[in-house]
């Protein structure tokens, strides 16, 4: 059998440990505030306080390998846009930002279609594209390899990447 009072020692040790844990829990907020870490501190700033420097904006964080394991990268599919609707100024964006709206869209109440600057050569290309689009499909960020010919959509189909899973919360209106 055990020694007399052995059960009391364990109970006393457990009680003291429990009191220390509760005390540390109550004092934890004071410890973190004195270190400069508040509940509103971003993970990037907390990491900087702990490691002594702020990571660069594009530098992976300490937890990024774990984040990549938990959440796989987004899968994209290509979508061809053959018609771009006019938009009202001041309305929300129906897709992620690609550039100035007027690069692709006509504004309701703005300049009319065909009022964009174009060279005579560009005007001929635009007129020929009314029957069948002459240009190859392009990305929205493609640089113009020819003289100005009005809006790109008149001669080219625009190819965009659309996420397969709509986790991002962006409502795609295409």
Swiss-Prot record:
One Pfam assignment: MCR
Residue ranges of the motif MCR 2: 138-158
Cofactor note: Probably binds 2 heme groups via the magnetochrome (MCR) motifs.
Induction pattern: Part of the probable 17 gene mamAB operon.
Keywords from the UniProt entry: Biomineralization, Heme, Iron, Magnetosome, Membrane, Metal-binding, Oxidoreductase, Transmembrane, Transmembrane helix
Job of this protein: May play a role in magnetite crystal maturation. May transfer electrons to balance the Fe(2+)-Fe(3+) ratio during magnetite formation.
Effect of deleting the gene: Normal magnetic response, slightly smaller, irregularly spaced magnetosomes. Near wild-type localization of MamC. Deletion of approximately 80 kb of DNA, including this operon, leads to cells that are non-magnetic, lack internal membrane systems, grow poorly, have reduced mobility and take-up and accumulate iron poorly.
Keyword GTP-binding listed: no
Cysteine pairings via disulfide bonds: none
Chain positions recorded as heme 1 binding sites: 101, 104-105
Protein name (Swiss-Prot/TrEMBL): Magnetosome protein MamT
Motif placement: MCR (magnetochrome) 1: 87-107
Membrane-topology annotation of the record: Single-pass membrane protein
Note: This bacteria makes up to 60 cubo-octahedral magnetosomes of about 45 nm in diameter which contain membrane-bound crystals of magnetite (Fe(3)O(4)).
GO molecular function annotations of the record: metal ion binding; oxidoreductase activity
InterPro entries: MCR, Multihaem_cyt_sf
UniProt entry tagged with the keyword Protein biosynthesis: no
Cytoplasmic-facing ranges: 1-9
Regions crossing the membrane: 10-28
Protein family membership: Belongs to the magnetosome MamT family.
């Amino acid at each position: 059998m055990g020694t007399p009072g052995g059960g009391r020692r364990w109970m006393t040790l457990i009680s003291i440990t429990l009191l220390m844990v509760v005390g540390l829990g109550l004092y934890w907020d004071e410890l973190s505030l004195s270190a400069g870490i508040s509940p509103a501190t971003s993970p990037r700033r907390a990491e900087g306080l702990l490691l002594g420097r702020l990571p660069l904006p594009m530098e992976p964080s300490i937890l990024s390998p774990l984040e990549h394991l938990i959440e796989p990268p987004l899968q994209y599919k290509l979508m061809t846009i053959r018609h771009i609707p006019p938009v009202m100024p001041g309305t929300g964006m129906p897709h992620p930002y690609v550039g100035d709206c007027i690069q692709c869209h006509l504004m309701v109440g703005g300049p009319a279609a065909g009022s964009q600057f174009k060279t005579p050569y560009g005007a001929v290309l635009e007129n020929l594209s009314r029957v069948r689009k002459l240009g190859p499909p392009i990305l929205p960020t493609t640089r113009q390899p020819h003289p100005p010919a009005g809006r790109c959509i008149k001669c080219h189909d625009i190819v965009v990447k659309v996420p397969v899973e709509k986790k991002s919360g962006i409502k795609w209106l295409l």
